């Protein structure tokens, strides 16, 4: 058409039709003029090849600085970002316009493509069923999940079979550790019903942090023994090279997005307790596995048979109960019944609990505490363990190290704050300790807390005598109840004379 450039496609059409038609017919079919057709027959070159190279239409703002300053900077620091080079050039040459950033970034990218260093290559792998399982941990802090209104600082242990895409996730309250790995891995293997030939994890650098050489060797041996129990060969990807675990790293993002969407549809990120949140995670993972159900069923026959029983998924430590009525373990102080003072206890550390044994007898289970990120010690206190001694020395409550952890519910702390503000310290401590003792003796912790809340909301102080009358009345003042048993003849009358005659 007049006024339009001839395209390469039009020339190809013309040359095609020219093999069987005249110049005029071929030109008409290619939508070009007769004169253009005769000219194209002589040139035998595509129109795009006849275009002269496009030159610059405006001055090059980097003409005097790129080779002289930018290139030496790129050679000296190959990993430097283009935006850092841009800021440095503006600092050196304030007269440069700020709009050169994109030009500089394109020029640096082109220079690196020609003169840059060789980059690491990722080699895609083919996978066989039943061959490889992957484990990793992912941080769930960005989801802002809360338990009973309190933020839940937790990780998610994530296991995945590479071939079928089977997944298992387990909520971890502490950081990365062998205990968390052992518990999560065994749950995953027993859930799928078999074990792969190889198990790959990262270098477990977080679990090895702050350990001495002997402890690191012990942890390595325990990990190898765990894999040997399930006849798996342990492998590790190189430290800091996430793409070597890419089959699970990418799955982290998909799983977290699924959890985030489920939380949005749920309408709240708060859960009543940890058990309900774990059930919520299990349901999401189950739905994801259902989408790969056929492939998972196809991989199961290729998995190794599981052993008869699980192996240990805990650490065992021996502690001695001190005169303070508890023991310190991993920067956390735990209270135990005072009758255990002086005894040596075996403690099994799980991710979320401690099982306490004396000899081979299980004594009690304690929730596991965590030291603060700043290194400050924490306490796990059960007031039932110390209340009998505290009643003898109520003033010890005033400056007690773990006073804040002693109160089983916020209402008791509110009551103590109100009492200490309006009464002498000795009287306030005495009343608070007696309130805790009342809850301990009568098993009315929740009911007493509700009554304290009503009293404090009415801007009154707790009345110990009145509360004792409600929850712990004096047995001597209880009314005598006389129970009169009914005569058996009255029951026979209810049965009727006809039935009585038949029985006779």
Swiss-Prot record:
Protein's name in the database: Uncharacterized protein y4jA/y4nE/y4sE
Keyword entries, A-Z: Plasmid
UniProt cross-references to Pfam families, sorted A to Z: Mu-transpos_C_2
Entries under InterPro entries matching the protein: Integrase_cat-core (IPR001584), IstA-like_C (IPR054353), RNaseH-like_sf (IPR012337)
SUPFAM superfamilies: Ribonuclease H-like
Transferase keyword on record: no
Domain Integrase catalytic residues, every copy: 125-309
GO biological process: DNA integration
Residue ranges, annotated region (Disordered): 36-60
Organism, as annotated: Sinorhizobium fredii (strain NBRC 101917 / NGR234)
Domain of life: Bacteria
């Amino acid at each position: 058409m007049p006024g339009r450039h001839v395209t390469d496609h039009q020339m190809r059409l013309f040359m095609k039709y020219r093999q069987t038609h005249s110049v005029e017919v071929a030109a008409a079919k290619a939508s070009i003029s007769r004169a253009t057709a005769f000219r194209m027959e002589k040139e035998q070159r595509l129109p795009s090849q006849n275009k002269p190279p496009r030159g610059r239409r405006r001055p090059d703002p980097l003409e005097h600085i790129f080779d002289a300053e930018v290139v030496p900077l790129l050679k000296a620091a190959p990993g430097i970002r283009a935006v850092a080079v841009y800021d440095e050039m503006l600092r050196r040459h304030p007269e440069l316009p700020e709009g050169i950033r994109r030009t500089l970034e394109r020029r640096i990218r082109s220079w690196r493509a020609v003169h840059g260093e060789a980059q690491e290559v990722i080699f895609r792998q083919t996978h066989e069923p039943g061959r490889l399982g992957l484990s990793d941990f992912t941080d769930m802090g960005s989801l802002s999940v809360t338990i009973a209104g309190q933020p839940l600082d937790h990780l998610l242990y994530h296991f995945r079979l590479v071939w079928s895409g089977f997944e298992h996730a387990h909520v971890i309250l502490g950081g990365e550790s062998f205990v968390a790995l052992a518990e999560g891995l065994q749950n995953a293997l027993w859930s799928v019903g078999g074990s792969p030939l190889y198990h790959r994890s990262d270098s477990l650098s977080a679990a090895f942090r702050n350990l001495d050489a002997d402890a690191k060797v012990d942890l390595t041996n325990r990990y190898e023994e765990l894999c040997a129990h399930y006849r798996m060969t342990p492998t590790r990807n190189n430290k800091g090279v996430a793409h070597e675990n890419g089959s699970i790293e990418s799955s982290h993002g998909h799983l977290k997005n699924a959890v985030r969407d489920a939380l949005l549809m749920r309408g709240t990120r708060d859960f009543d307790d940890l058990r309900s949140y774990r059930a919520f995670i299990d349901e999401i993972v189950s739905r994801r596995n259902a989408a790969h159900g056929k492939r998972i069923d196809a991989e199961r026959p290729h998995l190794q048979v599981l052993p008869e029983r699980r192996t240990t998924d805990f650490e065992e430590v021996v502690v001695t109960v001190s005169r303070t009525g508890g023991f310190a373990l991993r920067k956390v102080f735990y209270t135990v019944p005072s009758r255990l003072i002086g005894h040596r206890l075996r403690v099994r550390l799980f991710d979320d609990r401690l099982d306490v044994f004396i000899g081979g007898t299980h004594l009690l289970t304690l929730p596991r505490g965590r030291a603060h990120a700043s290194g400050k010690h924490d306490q796990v206190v059960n007031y039932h363990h110390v209340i009998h001694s505290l009643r003898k020395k109520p003033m010890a409550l005033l400056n007690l190290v773990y006073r804040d952890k002693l109160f089983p519910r916020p209402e008791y702390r509110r009551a103590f704050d109100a009492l200490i503000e309006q009464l002498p310290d000795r009287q306030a401590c005495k009343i608070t300790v007696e309130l805790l003792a009342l809850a301990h003796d009568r098993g009315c912790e929740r009911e007493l807390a509700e009554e304290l809340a009503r009293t404090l909301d009415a801007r009154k102080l707790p009345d110990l005598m009145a509360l004792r009358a409600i929850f712990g009345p004096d047995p001597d003042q209880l009314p005598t109840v006389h129970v009169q048993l009914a005569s058996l003849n009255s029951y026979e009358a209810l049965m009727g004379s006809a039935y009585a005659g038949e029985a006779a």
